[in-house]
Amino acid sequence: MADDMDSIMGFIMGNKQRERVVQILGSKGKMESDKVAKVTHIPAPSVKKILAEMAERDLVSEENGIWGLTVAGAEIEKELKKRG
């Protein structure tokens, strides 16, 4: 699991926008992708792509248009806080 965590942390930390999306969902909770875009000041199409990439890695999930961190995503958010 440590290798997986390091790999996922590299994926998130390698892109400031991904890092910001994780932080916002962690601090503000579940929200629509357009709201994530507004809060992070990242263009909506970019946010949608970021969320899709993160969903492929089971870091976020979507239900009825509302996105939130999964258990794995919450662990990554905690690790980001430690490393931050």
Which residue stretches match the model-derived regions?
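Minor-groove-contacting beta-hairpin "wing" of winged helix-turn-helix DNA-binding domains
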Residues: 65-72
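Short amphipathic alpha-helical interaction segments
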Residues: 42-55
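Short acidic, hydrophobic short linear motifs in intrinsically disordered regions
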Residues: 30-39
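A short, conserved structural fragment
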Residues: 55-65
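Short alpha-helical segments that sit at the start of domains
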Residues: 1-21
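Short helix-capping/hinge SLiMs at alpha-helix to coil transitions
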Residues: 25-28, 57
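Short, amphipathic alpha-helical interaction segments positioned at domain boundaries
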Residues: 74-84
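Residues within the helices of the helix-turn-helix
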Residues: 23, 34, 65
